[in-house]
């Protein structure tokens, strides 16, 4: 089986939406029956985004096999059925780390280690390994053409096109076509210069995706085709849309998938986008709306909670309601009080790290519990709910997590010091361990209590969800908390760790240690988010009476 590669680059400016465009194209190709995957190559020197600030980089998306990756992999999984793995994302830092390790080991037999061929070869090896077993692999190169950091990646994909053959490789370039209001027309010059930059590296794009706030007229696309040496039918207009889930249909309507299949000599049926049309219909025809407050510490950059925001929207689709998300800084709860939480139909506290704003989250959990407002806590959101319950119901005054107060009297949340990794090896950690790559990561089994709400929502006794955390419920202090009325609704497969808690005498109060947002998709949704949004709708109706 021959694997075909589509290399996706971006020019003129960053944040054009390469990830969404690549994922949308992959969705169309998948709908044609092709086995598709997507890779993201990030030019930064961090080994992975695990220790990067969410305010700078956005969320860290965790794959099933426990890799901490770029948020674009979340888009990929929401658009196609293929599950991403650690093979689907790597950085300059990872490549250099691998090459330097080999050099120290003597693998290069005394050769002078250079960017070409050693770094470029390492990049090519990883791309080829990630593409094994697939009909089509889309490879997104992070950053913008012209960035010094991207050069080794661009050189590597240039070489791959020569080595694999142009009949099995395509270069797809996203570029900005700005509209100039004063002139009353779109301008193609930035695109021409961007392609010129690519040509100087030795890459002739085969497809141009023209990003604009409006449809690019046919005459302007013809002009771009002429000056950039690309067939007219391969110049695609990609205008701004009110829903990213419309993009597969937009690309298909311009024949992009037909062009690619013809170039790769692939014989496959027409794409059936009925599932995406259903998503668009549900999104455009809600029967109501709810307002959900998300209380966190990184709210100045919504991308820090990208998967949570998308999962809430998916929950809305499953209930035919529009979900309005109100982002609330947990420090504002500390300074202004819980008054700012009024007029919400439900409250969600997502994951996070560090002490800043934690007391505001604890106050938020208490407000939701005492006022019967639907509550969903994720990761840290579960831990603050547990701390709040321990303090205010179980009588454990000043209960806390050792992450925030190491010597507190009631450490109801504590560091996980030992667990097994995906290979079955025992991992041991302490407070002095490195921050990078030292968490409980990836898919883990969870056994659900038969009497629990989550058992009803999931409809099965055992589930698998993804984790990213260092701290867990302290089993030594669990009994008095359970005696006070808290239900442990889910435990790890080995019965050692608390994964889900509920407040039984509350209409809907669920908190989980894992990250359900990572497995929610627009077509399938997720049981927790669907149930949470439904609870928000029911709360709204009760309040209206």
Swiss-Prot record:
Record InterPro entries: Class_I_gatase-like (IPR029062), CTP_synthase (IPR004468), CTP_synthase_N (IPR017456), GATASE (IPR017926), GATase1_CTP_Synthase (IPR033828), P-loop_NTPase (IPR027417)
Pathway(s): Pyrimidine metabolism; CTP biosynthesis via de novo pathway; CTP from UDP: step 2/2
Coiled coil: none
GO MF entries: ATP binding; CTP synthase activity; glutaminase activity; identical protein binding; metal ion binding
Location of region: Amidoligase domain: 1-266
Record's GO cellular component terms: cytosol
Residues where UTP binds: 14, 187-192, 223
UniProt cross-references to Pfam families, sorted A to Z: CTP_synth_N, GATase
Keyword Ligase: yes
Single GO BP term: 'de novo' CTP biosynthetic process
Enzyme Commission identifier(s): 6.3.4.2
Binding sites annotated in the UniProt record for Mg(2+): 72, 140
Protein residues bound to CTP: 14, 147-149, 187-192, 223
Binding site for L-glutamine: 352, 380-383, 403, 470
Other facts noted in the record for this chain: CTPSs have evolved a hybrid strategy for distinguishing between UTP and CTP. The overlapping regions of the product feedback inhibitory and substrate sites recognize a common feature in both compounds, the triphosphate moiety. To differentiate isosteric substrate and product pyrimidine rings, an additional pocket far from the expected kinase/ligase catalytic site, specifically recognizes the cytosine and ribose portions of the product inhibitor.
PANTHER family cross-referenced by the UniProt entry: CTP SYNTHASE, CTP SYNTHASE-RELATED
Name used for this protein in its record: CTP synthase
Species in which this protein is naturally found: Klebsiella pneumoniae (strain 342)
